[in-house]
A protein has these predicted regions:
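Short, structured beta-strand/loop micro-motifs enriched in basic residues and often containing a Trp
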Residues: 85-98
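Short, well-ordered loop/turn sites that connect or cap secondary structure elements
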Residues: 107-110
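Bacterial N-terminal signal peptides
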Residues: 12-21
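Sequence context surrounding c-type heme c attachment/ligation sites in exported
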Residues: 25-33, 104, 122-362
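Bacterial Sec-dependent N-terminal signal peptides
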Residues: 21-46
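Bacterial N-terminal signal peptides that target proteins for export
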Residues: 2-11
Length: 362
C-alpha cells in the first residue's frame, strides 16, 4: 500500500490595495509542495529513515510532516534515561478503532508507529544526540519492526538488523555526568521479547492504548487531548466511551501513591508479565486493569525466583529489604536478577523512590 497523494497546501494571500478613490480585495493562491509520506508495504523497510518523508526539513529537527501526529503515554517506559519522541501515521482514508480502555488501538494496515530515542546535554559538546529510531509497520500479515541508527552528523539514520553499542555521556539536571554503553536491540529476536504473545504468535505495539494517552499534549495548533486529536484528524473512529479508566503520571504527587505505582508497573512491566508474554509463567500481572488486586503486583506473593535472605516473597509489606521486587528494580550489576532484563543498565532513581514509599506504606 502506498500513500502517494500529492499533498499541496494552498495559502490565501489577501492583498488589500488602497487608493485615494477606491479599495479592492484580491485573492492570490500560492501553492507550496510538500513531499508525501511514503510507506509502500511491498518495499518497506526502506534503507534510510529519510526515504519515508516522515519529517520535513533537516531530519534531526524531527518536524513531523502532514499526517504524522505526535503521541505520548502519560507515564513512559524507562530506557536508561533516554528521552523519546513518538509519532503515528496512517494511510489516507484509514483510521484506528477503540477496543477497550486497556488494549492497544486497533490500527489499520499500513499504519506506522515511530519512536525516536535521544539524549540532551551529551558530552563533550553539551548537545542533543539522536541515537536510534524504531518503526513498527502494520502489514496485512501483521506488524514488522525496523531499526534505524543515526550517524554522527545527525543527517541520516540507516536500517540495521543487528544490535549495536555506543558509549554515551550526558549531564543531568544536577550537572552530574552519566556514562553508559547504549545498546540497540537485535531486531529479529529482542523486539519480540516485549512485543510478542507467544501463545498465539501475535505481535503488537505497547503504549498506544486509550488508558495511556487520555491526556493533553502540545500540537502545532495548541494543547489537546490525544484521543480527541486523533478523532478530529480522522485517525480514530469516534466510538469511545464517555469515561476511560486511565493511568496517571507516576511523578504526579497529586495522585494517590497506589495509582502512581500501578501506572508505572503498567507501562514498564505489563508487556512481559501478561498471558502469553515472556514471563507468563510467573504469578505477577501488572496490567493497570488487573492491579486493583495488590497480589497481582506481588504483595505477600510467593516469588518465582529464590533470592537468599528475602524469604521468597516478591513484596513484603513494610520491608523493602525483604522484597525481591525492590531488589530486582534496584540492582545494576546482578545480571541474573536485574529487572527489566532489556533496556536498563541504570537504576531508575525516581521509580525506586516511588516503590520504596509504596512498600513502606503497605
Amino acid at each position: 500500500m502506498t500513500f502517494n497523494l500529492n499533498v499541496k497546501y494552498r495559502l490565501i494571500a489577501l492583498l488589500i490595495v488602497l487608493t485615494a478613490n477606491s479599495s479592492c480585495t484580491k485573492e492570490e493562491y500560492v501553492t507550496i509542495d510538500s513531499k508525501p509520506v511514503v510507506a509502500d508495504l511491498t518495499q518497506v523497510p526502506y534503507p534510510k529513515l529519510s526515504d519515508y518523508n516522515f519529517f520535513e526539513g533537516a531530519l534531526k529537527n524531527l518536524k513531523p510532516a502532514f499526517g504524522v501526529l505526535p503521541y505520548k503515554p502519560v507515564t513512559e517506559l524507562f530506557s536508561d534515561y533516554a528521552l523519546k519522541k513518538r509519532f503515528v501515521w496512517m494511510p489516507n482514508g484509514t483510521k484506528a478503532t477503540y477496543v477497550n480502555d486497556y488494549s492497544v488501538l486497533n490500527l489499520p494496515v499500513g499504519a506506522v508507529l515511530i519512536k525516536v530515542f535521544y539524549y540532551n546535554n551529551v558530552q563533550p559538546s553539551n548537545s542533543t544526540k539522536i541515537i536510534e529510531t524504531r518503526l513498527m509497520i502494520r502489514k496485512a500479515s501483521g506488524w514488522i519492526f525496523a531499526e534505524y541508527i543515526w550517524n554522527n552528523e545527525q543527517t541520516e539514520a540507516l536500517l540495521i538488523t543487528q544490535s549495536t553499542t555506543r558509549q554515551i555521556s550526558w549531564s543531568d539536571s544536577n550537572s552530574v555526568i552519566h556514562t553508559i554503553d547504549y545498546r540497540t536491540p537485535e531486531v529479529d529476536f529482542e523486539c519480540l521479547r516485549c512485543h510478542a504473545r507467544f501463545n498465539n504468535e501475535l505481535i503488537e505495539p505497547l503504549g498506544i492504548k486509550p488508558q495511556n494517552i487520555n491526556h493533553a499534549i502540545n500540537y502545532s495548533d495548541g494543547p489537546k487531548n490525544q484521543l480527541n486529536k486523533l478523532i478530529e484528524f480522522g485517525y480514530l473512529e469516534n466510538n469511545l466511551p464517555e469515561n476511560i479508566v486511565s493511568t496517571v503520571d507516576f511523578e504526579d504527587t497529586s495522585k494517590s501513591l497506589n495509582l502512581r505505582v500501578r501506572s508505572y508497573f503498567d507501562i514498564n512491566c505489563t508487556h512481559c508479565h501478561i498471558d502469553g508474554g515472556e514471563s507468563t509463567m510467573h504469578n505477577l500481572r501488572f496490567a493497570f486493569n488487573e492491579t486493583t488486586n495488590p497480589m497481582k503486583m506481588g504483595v505477600g506473593a510467593h516469588a518465582a525466583h529464590y533470592l537468599e535472605g528475602y524469604n521468597n516473597v516478591t513484596v513484603t509489606p513494610g520491608n523493602i529489604n525483604k522484597s525481591i521486587l525492590h531488589y530486582r528494580m534496584y540492582t545494576e550489576d546482578d545480571l541474573l536478577y536485574i529487572m527489566p532484563p532489556l533496556g536498563r543498565t541504570q537504576r531508575h532513581e525516581e521509580a525506586i523512590q516511588l516503590i520504596e514509599s509504596w512498600i513502606n506504606s503497605l
